[in-house]
Amino acid sequence: MMQYSPKFNNAKVLVLGDVMLDRYWFGATNRISPEAPVPVVKVQDIEERAGGAANVAMNIASLSVPVALHGLIGQDDAGRALDKLLNSHNIQNHCVALDSHPTITKLRILSRHQQLLRLDFEEGFHHVASDSLLAKLEQEITAYGALILSDYGKGTLESVQQMIQVARKAGVPTLIDPKGTDFERYRGATLLTPNMSEFEAVVGHCKDDDEIVEKGLKLIADFELTALLVTRSEKGMTLLRPNQAPFHLPTQAKEVYDVTGAGDTVISVLATAIADGRPYEEACYLANAAAGVVVGKLGTSTVTPTELENAIHHREETGFGILAEDELKRAVEQAKQRGEKIVMTNGCFDILHPGHVSYLENARKLGDRLIVAVNTDESVKRLKGESRPINDLNARMAVLAGLASVDWVVPFAEDTPQRLIGEILPNLLVKGGDYKPEEIAGSQEVWANGGEVKVLNFENGCSTTNVIKKIQASK
């Protein structure tokens, strides 16, 4: 099978739609309120994430693709929080800030990895500033390879038909994740991406794949679409186009923790691939792989190029293996939110031997996920001498990543991983050898965060130095 690339060097995407701020309050629930039969949540952590059309833009930016966001927000704290989030991800924020309406905000309260309550703060933007949005679209559309119209029914896309016509006139593909049953308003769009429930709400119940194809092709003809992608949860997705065979893709999700924002990820990757000049089949393949990654995360999330590449190559799990430091931080954050215990260790691991394998297996048994931080080649030379390492960094990390006991491998350039450990803050820090816990780099940071530090024994007679001596003696 052809291997597709997650690098989109020629893509540039414009997103226009209902912009929201997603707030998450995480906390422990250990008692019932004396005031009413409801749990008391002691809030321990607060997160703010871009939602709606803003999450679509975040998904595109996470793929290192230029993206601009148009929409409506309020002149309030939520709007300022969104602006800060978007700027931190290099998203061109062209949203109109109004003093007459609040930013649409959704607050979710979670405990023990379960959502207890959602609070919506919104008035919508019906009959507000549609002329301004349309004028800005006309000015900028020709600079982009694709337009996403993100419709959550909040009023930003009241002029959606005129927006579609502006894009058609400019020759720019328009992709829409539809809302409601009035698909007439999307007439002339390039591609719609309804989920199965949304699709059946318009065409009626479909008893099998043949009926999905039949009714989907009729919908394409009725509303003058170029294509239709029906996302079907555990059954994957189906791409339909006139006079072409249907293209079915099975789901790639291994574990599903949260489907929040999965539709945003699908349309983001689709539009990015199409803007990059990829065929529809390839765009759908990439979008399907990305969806399989994002549903394994908690809350509104994005997918990185590394995660997408892992999924494309059918690696056993996405978001694992060799990661850059920023990618590891995101992966660890998601794992902690799922309640997983993170174990971390470090070393040169120059020539992997049975002692290493046994040590890493024992470390992994102490938690749910194991991080191995590896000295770079320059760091090894400073510690071990100019003749080391025998194997370069890429080779050492590749071997470690292939072990079943290892979830993440990350390089560090310093002599010790103290800074990295302080950034990651594992639940358990492990080191092999004759150390005292307080002598281990990073131990103070882990203890200060409420974590543990343990020393594990290496197998007697197993060392890289002994392996090198045996090799030299055999020559």
Curated annotation (Swiss-Prot):
Gene Ontology CC: cytosol
GO biological-process terms attached to the record: ADP-L-glycero-beta-D-manno-heptose biosynthetic process
Catalytic positions are D264
Identify the pathway.
Answer: Nucleotide-sugar biosynthesis; ADP-L-glycero-beta-D-manno-heptose biosynthesis; ADP-L-glycero-beta-D-manno-heptose from D-glycero-beta-D-manno-heptose 7-phosphate: step 1/4; Nucleotide-sugar biosynthesis; ADP-L-glycero-beta-D-manno-heptose biosynthesis; ADP-L-glycero-beta-D-manno-heptose from D-glycero-beta-D-manno-heptose 7-phosphate: step 3/4
Q: What class of enzyme is it?
A: transferase
State the residue spans of region: Cytidylyltransferase. 344-475
**Catalytic reaction annotation:** D-glycero-beta-D-manno-heptose 7-phosphate + ATP = D-glycero-beta-D-manno-heptose 1,7-bisphosphate + ADP + H(+); D-glycero-beta-D-manno-heptose 1-phosphate + ATP + H(+) = ADP-D-glycero-beta-D-manno-heptose + diphosphate
SUPFAM superfamilies, per the entry = Nucleotidylyl transferase, Ribokinase-like
Listed EC numbers: 2.7.1.167, 2.7.7.70
Coiled-coil segments, which residues? none
- Note the Pfam families from the entry: CTP_transf_like (PF01467), PfkB (PF00294)
**Where along the chain is ATP bound?**
N195, M196, S197, E198
> Known CDD domains for this protein?
RfaE_like (cd01172)
Ribokinase as annotated region, ranges: 1-318
Entry GO MF terms: ATP binding; heptose 7-phosphate kinase activity; heptose-1-phosphate adenylyltransferase activity; phosphotransferase activity, alcohol group as acceptor
What keywords does the record list, in alphabetical order? Answer: ATP-binding, Carbohydrate metabolism, Kinase, Multifunctional enzyme, Nucleotide-binding, Nucleotidyltransferase, Transferase
Question: Would you indicate the residue range of the signal peptide?
Answer: none
Q: Which family does it belong to?
A: In the N-terminal section; belongs to the carbohydrate kinase PfkB family.
What does this gene product do? Catalyzes the ADP transfer from ATP to D-glycero-beta-D-manno-heptose 1-phosphate, yielding ADP-D-glycero-beta-D-manno-heptose.
Oligomeric state and interaction partners are given as:
Homodimer.
Q: Tell me the PANTHER family matching this sequence.
A: BIFUNCTIONAL PROTEIN HLDE
UniProt-recorded name of the protein: Bifunctional protein HldE
Q: Which organism is it from?
A: Actinobacillus pleuropneumoniae serotype 5b (strain L20)
